[in-house]
Amino acid sequence: LGDPDLPKREGCYLPGLAAGGVQLQDRFGDLSHPGVSSAEMAFLAAAPTRMEALLIERLPGLLPQLGVDDLAELAKAAVLDTQVSPTINLNGIFELVPADVTTQQALQTMLSELMHQLLAEAAGQGLEESFFLHVAPNLGRDAQGQERIKPAAAGDVGTTDIQFMLTGSIKEAGLLVLLNQHIQRRWGESPLGETFNVRTAPHDPEALLALVQQRIPAERMPLLVGVGDTVTSTASADGTGWLRGGSDRGFLNLLQDLGAWCGRSNRVVLVDSSHGEVDRPSHADGTLRGITDPEDPLRIDTLMPDGPEQYIAWFRQLSERRRVG
């Protein structure tokens, strides 16, 4: 753009939500975190350094062939220092053991134990209800509501990262935040309340759907297009059903259910991010194996097999049409 200050001055940023809806950005690039305490922000700020230290402690036993300097570099690269969702990503480490499923599974177990240690440390500071772990990709939730790790298998590394997230920061709740903001701009009122945010929202998908049905007139619902890249479906070990998960499945299901309720043809778009961006099942052969199944209630309307570049081109085209219209 030539001028680094122009986007902020002219309001060129894309407004929206990040980190499961807990971080808001306006078109001037200003960030806010409704419902988040200063103690929580302080713990999150220190978390990446702590994650790196814990990795350096635990990796030598799993990767004995690496020296101290290599391990330190690997640990640093694995920690993603995002402000409100610090993450450990194993993709770079998995590249060192590409065909060693046993070591890959051991790394996944190590990662889970490490992140649970971080949860315990937060609880020790009086923040026991503040955080949760988001596993990506996952195999849905267990009986305790915890996201299941997708174990590495031949040809599929499974879970690659775990995010340390604020409670309430789920995309389904973020969808309601966006709906509330849209109706406020369009109709001048906030049906879910002026201070509604993901931390005050219900966590259960059925409760979120019921809240919309109770508070928002169906005729005020906009057409929604949901875009995701992480949806999984794996046959259960006993062969009697499917373990469905993926970090985008929940909000895409809710978006679909909202459309069925209000009579809108909401659309679900799935982007193939298996081209080196992350380790995910590919759309290439058209079977969508590992992504969906014949009994899947989530209906995918559009596939973008060429990945992020195809999505960006589509988004630009959509923006041009909107501007012309």
Where are these regions (language model features)?
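Well-ordered, non-membrane alpha-helical segments in soluble/globular domains
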Residues: 1, 39-63, 100-125, 172, ...
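Short linear motifs at secondary-structure transitions and domain/linker junctions
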Residues: 1, 60-66, 138-140, 196-203, ...
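Active-site phosphate-binding/coordination module
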Residues: 1-83
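Short flexible/disordered coil segments
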Residues: 5-7, 13, 51-52, 75-93, ...
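Noncatalytic linker/hinge segments flanking ATPase motor cores
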Residues: 22-29, 56-66, 127-137, 268-276
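Short catalytic/ligand-binding loop motif for oxyanion handling, primarily in non-cytosolic enzymes
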Residues: 24-26, 97, 234, 278-279
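Conserved acidic, metal-coordinating active-site core of Asp-based
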Residues: 71-223, 231-235
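Mg2+-dependent phosphoryl-transfer enzymes with acidic/Ser/Thr/Gly-rich catalytic loops
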Residues: 165, 172-325
